[in-house]
């Protein structure tokens, strides 16, 4: 399956190119033409919280700003939506006049303290000047005004030094703890796992694929931590490393998807075609391989489509676009189909050992596929700024638990078969000789 691996890497790299404009230190230019075309140039948005949040804007060309009567307008996101949806609509000047906060840009640096309600709220920042609401057709003249804008929330001591918005707060600490857990776990179990893999046996290939997926998830957590550590200092982070974190995560998802599908499809198809006395194998049959490859390619295409459709670049796990909804539907369908297939295998299986094996495997599969749809439904009951964090943290933890379940399952059975010196023909899972010699995704 080397070609499948190359396809996965190509798709994930193409859809997760470094994203710009995601930091809370914003750099750009105030443009009279852009402000006039849109009746207010959108600069950015931020989830402020606390009583001492700060907006700091710096410019160099003060004379041009004064000549243009440059101003910044801050709207609460909900109020801004009401203005856009109001009927009859407000004129340009009436809309700007309803801004909750206004800053007249007349100095090199302006600091605006945002007094906030107890609950965090999203604020949108717009630029406008004397040319923005004019009715004449003459194009606005004059230079653009380069700016740097820093958006800060209060830290634990109440000082406006936190670059993280309410939507992102706590993720830095979460990824630090996650990386720490991965490191400690590796120190404890890496040697024994390596020895188990060196011994070979019927679980060898599965453990290799599962370990690769786990290493990709650990690399994603480390890249996220590095990006957020830099982000906490300058509000920009390292977009390339942040994008690599998503690449690693998606590659891990595809790796696990192919593993789970290959195992389950192989078992169910072989069960239908062979007598029940024959062992269930991870056979490289055209049917099982074709189904797995088709679903993996489908998920990869949906992930690529989602990145082009979701311009707001939310968390990779919080699917908000049409493609994201299709991904959720795909996961639900996979969980149901694999669950039904395994249920059929379990009901006709006479061996208690095999039944226990399949039941535990089914639990890991269902948890892996259904955690994201379930958390997405639960997140509806929470505030908007809490949803991305809930889904991101919940999916990572649930999938980690699913991988632990699968690791315990395969390692325990590998040890049992080794100690018992059972023939591979009697095992509930073997790998055919033709399949063993092939590289697996």
UniProtKB/Swiss-Prot annotation:
Q: Name one GO biological process term.
A: response to food
Question: May I ask which residue range the UniProt record assigns to the signal sequence?
Answer: 1-23
List localization entries. Answer: Membrane
Per UniProt, what is the membrane topology?
Multi-pass membrane protein
Task: Please give the InterPro entries that the UniProt record associates with this protein.
Answer: GPR180-like_N, GPR180/TMEM145, GPR180/TMEM145_TM
Q: Say which species the protein is native to.
A: Mus musculus (Mouse)
Q: Please provide the record's keywords in A-Z order.
A: Glycoprotein, Membrane, Signal, Transmembrane, Transmembrane helix
Residue ranges spanning the membrane: these are: 174-194, 206-226, 250-270, 285-305, 322-342, 361-381, 390-410
* Positions of glycan attachment: 111
Per the record, its GO cellular-component terms are:
membrane
**Protein known as:** Integral membrane protein GPR180
């Amino acid at each position: 399956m080397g070609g499948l691996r190359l396809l996965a890497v190509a798709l994930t790299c193409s859809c997760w190119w470094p994203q710009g404009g995601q930091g809370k230190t914003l750099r750009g230019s105030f443009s009279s033409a852009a402000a006039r075309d849109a009746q207010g140039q959108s600069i950015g948005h931020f989830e402020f919280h606390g009583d001492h949040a700060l907006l700091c804007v710096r410019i160099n060309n003060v004379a041009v700003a004064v000549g243009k009567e440059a101003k910044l307008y801050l709207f609460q996101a909900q109020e801004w939506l009401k203005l856009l949806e109001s009927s009859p609509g407000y004129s340009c000047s009436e809309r700007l006049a309803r801004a909750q906060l206004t800053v007249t840009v007349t100095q090199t640096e302006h600091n605006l303290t945002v007094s906030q309600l107890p609950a965090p709220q999203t604020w949108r920042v717009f630029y406008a000047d004397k040319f923005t609401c004019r009715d004449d057709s003459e194009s606005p003249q004059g230079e653009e005004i380069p700016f740097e804008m820093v958006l800060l929330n209060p830290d634990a001591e109440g000082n406006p030094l936190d670059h993280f918005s309410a939507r992102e707060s706590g993720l830095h600490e979460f990824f630090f703890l996650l990386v720490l857990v991965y490191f400690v776990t590796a120190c404890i179990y890496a040697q024994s796992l390596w020895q188990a893999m060196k011994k070979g046996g019927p679980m060898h290939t599965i453990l290799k694929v599962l370990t690769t997926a786990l290493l990709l998830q650990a690399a994603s957590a480390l890249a996220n931590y590095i990006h957020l550590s830099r982000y906490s200092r300058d509000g920009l982070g390292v977009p390339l490393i942040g994008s690599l974190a998503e690449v690693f995560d998606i590659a891990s998802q595809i790796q696990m998807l192919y593993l789970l599908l290959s195992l389950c499809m192989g078992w169910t198809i072989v069960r239908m075609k062979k007598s029940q006395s024959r062992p269930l194998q991870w056979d490289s049959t055209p049917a099982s391989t074709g189904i797995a490859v088709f679903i993996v390619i489908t998920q990869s295409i949906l992930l690529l489509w989602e990145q082009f459709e979701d311009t707001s670049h939310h968390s990779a796990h919080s699917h908000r676009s049409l493609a994201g909804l299709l991904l959720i539907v795909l996961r639900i369908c996979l969980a149901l189909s694999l669950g039904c297939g395994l249920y059929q295998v379990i009901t006709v299986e006479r061996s208690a050992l095999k039944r226990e094996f399949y039941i535990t495997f089914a639990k890991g599969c269902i948890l892996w596929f259904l955690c994201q749809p379930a958390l997405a439904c639960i997140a509806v009951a929470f505030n908007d700024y809490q949803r991305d964090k809930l889904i991101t943290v919940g999916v990572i933890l649930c999938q980690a638990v699913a991988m632990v379940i699968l690791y315990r399952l395969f390692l325990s059975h590998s040890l049992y078969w080794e100690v018992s010196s059972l023939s591979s023909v009697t095992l509930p899972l073997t790998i055919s000789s033709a399949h063993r010699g092939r590289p697996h995704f």
